[in-house]
């Protein structure tokens, strides 16, 4: 007797459906792993064509239970749990963004805020080679104050860290004798970065002014021959002229006003009425005597704008390259960790990073060379090699820190990687792009940051500033490389253990 579908009892039919569902659930994880491996490459269909399994995904029973049926409204009673989840995530995300703004951004903004109150930390030099009182005629009958006698009064009104010398004290301290040796030593002190700038008042300014006023054959008085400000833009191309050099310009402005209103008129009166000298009839001489300006001598000038790329913002891009290389190698590192012993895996990781940075640093430096930057100012024809090797050390130091930090951040969640890289960039550039002398002492942590040290090295290469800090700069970079390399196996073990624990918890909950 033939049975139809209607003859089957409902209970038996329900049991068949339950068995089918049970089997499908047991195979769901194995199936998902297979599909997961195939998604990136596509799944071949029966005709041998590659299809994308993500185009028409089949909803499984787990998805159906995890999410309630769509009600069409965010405020549906069925979505009460989801609304709570969204609210908590919203609050957490905004709190995290607030923390970043009120820590990292505050750190960067603070490096630029109210820098004038830190002028007392800026070391400046003043050398006055002319005595405060000058004898103007051969008979020693005309004694007048020198042009620069009041300069210390104006200098002390500006709260910088001043070192003021007259000619005898400067010669004794620095073992120099002649005025030319004094001038050369002033330049050397600025070059060695003992001072941010120096005001050098040279001798015989008052006598030259007097001769120009009474003698038609004397040269015109030119104050810039006797007043010189020595500085180096190459020491800080973006900040020195805007934040520190204005101090010298302010002193020049103050003293010019004092000279034209308070010094020159009484001097002219003394010359004509007290000492009975006749002033020159040449108006050009009188007009020239009314000007009192400084000569600004930039010992290491910044003349090529393209150098801002490798010595400032380009360093940030180089830092980001060290972050990207780790992300690109991430899947390969996971695969190799499964087939290599721990010791061999560690050697593999270090070798991959070091060789990658070796070539990446070459590519970065070649980009600078493409724009015809002069590498010969400090190290001659070997300048490019010095630049390349310095960049390699920088990438090793920064890349090692990134690699260790990224592994730790991933244990919290890969969604936080952006916060790390943003924080790492700001921690590096805040004490590196702006002079530490004009910042709070908290920014002195920058001395141990890779960006700060490599920028110092780059300024030697491109501007030929002093090399006296290069030993410290290279030493810190090498120390950072050694530290990050030593921490790598411990950080790797910790991150691996945490990820395994997360995987076990997830497996138990599934």
Curated annotation (Swiss-Prot):
Name of the protein in its database record: Uncharacterized endoplasmic reticulum membrane protein YJR015W
Extent of Basic and acidic residues compositional bias: 53-66
Family: To yeast SNG1.
UniProt keyword Zinc present: no
PANTHER family: NITROSOGUANIDINE RESISTANCE PROTEIN SNG1
Side Cytoplasmic, residues: 111-123, 334-349, 403-416, 496-510
Disordered: annotated segments: 38-76
Biased composition (Low complexity): 67-76
Bilayer topology: Multi-pass membrane protein
The keyword DNA-binding is annotated on this UniProt entry: no
Transmembrane segments annotated in the record for this chain: 90-110, 124-144, 313-333, 350-370, 382-402, 417-437, 475-495
Compartmental location: Endoplasmic reticulum membrane
Additional notes on this entry: Present with 639 molecules/cell in log phase SD medium.
Keywords from the UniProt entry: Endoplasmic reticulum, Membrane, Transmembrane, Transmembrane helix
One family name in Pfam for this protein: DUF3533
GO cellular component assignments: cytoplasm; endoplasmic reticulum; endoplasmic reticulum membrane; membrane
Cystine residue pairs: none
Main location: endoplasmic reticulum
Residues in compartment: Lumenal: 1-89, 145-312, 371-381, 438-474
